Amino acid sequence: AEEIWEYASRTLTQSAASVAATVAGSTITAIRGDTLSAALENIGALTNYSKLWFTVKADEADTDATAQVQIELAGGLLYINGAAATTAANGSITINDESTGDVTILLKAPETAKLSPGSYYYDIQIQSSTGILVSTLTSGMFVVAADVTRATS
């Protein structure tokens, strides 16, 4: 069997847009109108929790109901661009490793298309299974880059 690097040709199996929607340090960058799939690793153990949220806001003092994005582990996409989401399945949080706290945030293209280019704040919070303790596991900047092509059909 040949080693992969010995093949006559190789095919990129991930789009450049998927690669661009990345996490660098504590900054998540998404391209407006593209599906965001961002892997965050080692954010802290995800055990004994009842809720987990990923929230993006223009100002940290904004209410959750006016968030640019809010996704809840069990509930999916709750808010988009300051309004209640109409399709909860367009956003999700997947726990990849509970012990280290590896998660993947997914926000589908129809939802990122609703976001204005700019810099925002994000965090991931967890509520303990007792319902009392809420902790911020990680936070940083969420950048929405403008898309060049706006055609959808």
Predicted regions span which residues?
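Fibrous stalk/shaft segments of extracellular and virion attachment machinery
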Residues: A1-A20
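Contiguous segments within soluble domain cores/interaction surfaces
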Residues: S15-S153
